[in-house]
Amino acid sequence: MAREGKRIRAAREGIDPTKVYSLADAVKLIKERAKAKFDETFEISMNLGVDPRHADQMVRGVCNLPNGSGRTVRVAVFARGAKADEAKAAGADIVGAEDLLETIQGGTINFDRCIATPDMMPLVGRLGKVLGPRGLMPNPKVGTVTMDVKGAVGAAKGGAVEFRVEKAGIVHAGIGKVSFDDQKIVENARAFADAVARAKPSGAKGTYIQRIAVSSTMGPGIKVDPASVLAAATA
């Protein structure tokens, strides 16, 4: 514990907790302080002016990160026939129908993203209580219920990140690795923030994007000026 405390203190050194940094400066500070023995994930957290308890203030969507996420994504696809073949050819890790349902019901969930063709949803719907809490339930709003199986698998493998606002009005996601070039992290952060901005619900009132912070997996959070993050939208 003493070693961990020393590492955390060292990571916080030189960071003013009261200051709001530009995105570029925050990225530099985080990369300089990422000393874990693995390639830490670069994370972004956005506080939104919404109350997700109201349906007209729910924020949900997907962002295709221009430089990928840096992580290996295992994709499962519910499909039959030609669409199952399409999924396999596109690189899906697991493809099935009733057999995949039984595997999941048996407690085996060894995938990070789940895609389904529309005709499979009555079957997939039986897994709502299992997949829903894990954020794995296919949903047409984020492109995971679709006939374009090839495109959906490609997007998932290529760095598509789903997001959904939490009860406290926060959206967060991993948007790369600290080993990425600074500019690639900046581009990913801006793409994600823009996707969240475009997903602004009709019921949102006042300032929509209130605060933004970035961090690495093991590092401290750094406050960031929203204006330095939003590339094509305003808070």
From Swiss-Prot:
Q: Does the keyword tRNA-binding apply?
A: yes
Q: Which GO terms describe its molecular function?
A: rRNA binding; structural constituent of ribosome; tRNA binding
The record's annotation in InterPro entries points to: Ribosom_uL1_bac-type, Ribosomal_uL1, Ribosomal_uL1-like, Ribosomal_uL1/biogenesis, Ribosomal_uL1_3-a/b-sand, Ribosomal_uL1_CS
Extract one GO cellular component term from the record.
cytosolic large ribosomal subunit
PROSITE patterns hit by this protein: RIBOSOMAL_L1 (PS01199)
* Entries under SUPFAM superfamilies matching the protein: Ribosomal protein L1
Q: Name one Pfam family in it.
A: Ribosomal_L1
Q: Name the keywords, alphabetized.
A: Repressor, Ribonucleoprotein, Ribosomal protein, RNA-binding, rRNA-binding, Translation regulation, tRNA-binding
Which N-terminal stretch is annotated as signal sequence?
A: none
Taxonomically, which superkingdom? Bacteria
Q: Which CDD domains match?
A: Ribosomal_L1
Asked if Ribosomal protein is a keyword of the record, the answer is: yes
Entry's Gene Ontology BP terms: regulation of translation; translation
Q: What does this protein do?
A: Binds directly to 23S rRNA. The L1 stalk is quite mobile in the ribosome, and is involved in E site tRNA release. Protein L1 is also a translational repressor protein, it controls the translation of the L11 operon by binding to its mRNA.
Q: Which family is annotated?
A: Belongs to the universal ribosomal protein uL1 family.
Oligomeric state and interaction partners are given as: Part of the 50S ribosomal subunit.
Name the record gives this protein: Large ribosomal subunit protein uL1
Q: What is the lineage of its organism?
A: Bacteria, Pseudomonadati, Pseudomonadota, Alphaproteobacteria, Hyphomicrobiales
